[in-house]
């Protein structure tokens, strides 16, 4: 595959991944706003515990999404620095082959570590979102039961 096709596929992949992450962040923000709107006139009670757990789950989902984006940014920067080192144009590494080899290896290790963290945070962003949604549904069912039995 020519370099242009590889670059274009990589660009498309990054775009899709970023859009997905931002979509999940927006869903979480909307879910929290919806929960706040539903409970604006409510008083605290034990029946709200599942809602509190849902909000915590959504907060953790938001945190994981933000951390994922931070690691993506850091990885892109590390890739940029790796290319500069390998081309011999990095101001600190220069063209010294030993320094270039050592710097390249260190940067590759950092990229691999970042990639693992990106995967970790991406998985947990989704998991916490779903957990929050499940606890929200549990809370909603409890509220419906309480309204039914209070009639």
Region locations from a protein language model:
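Cytosolic-side membrane-entry/anchor segment at the start of a transmembrane helix
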Residues: 1-41
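Alpha-helical transmembrane segments of integral membrane proteins
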Residues: 44-151
């Amino acid at each position: 595959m020519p370099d242009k096709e590889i670059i274009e596929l990589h660009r498309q992949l990054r775009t899709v991944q970023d859009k997905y992450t931002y979509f999940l962040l927006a869903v979480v923000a909307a879910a929290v706003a919806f929960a706040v709107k539903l409970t604006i006139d409510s008083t605290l009670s034990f029946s709200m515990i599942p809602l509190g757990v849902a909000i915590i789950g959504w907060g953790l989902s938001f945190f994981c999404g933000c951390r994922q984006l931070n690691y993506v940014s850091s990885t892109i920067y590390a890739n940029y620095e790796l290319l500069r080192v390998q081309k011999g144009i990095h101001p600190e590494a220069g063209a010294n082959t030993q320094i270039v080899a050592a710097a390249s290896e260190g940067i590759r290790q950092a990229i691999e570590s970042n990639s693992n963290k990106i995967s970790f945070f991406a998985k947990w962003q989704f998991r916490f979102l779903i957990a929050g949604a499940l606890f929200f549904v549990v809370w909603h069912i409890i509220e419906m039961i309480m309204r039914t039995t209070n009639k």
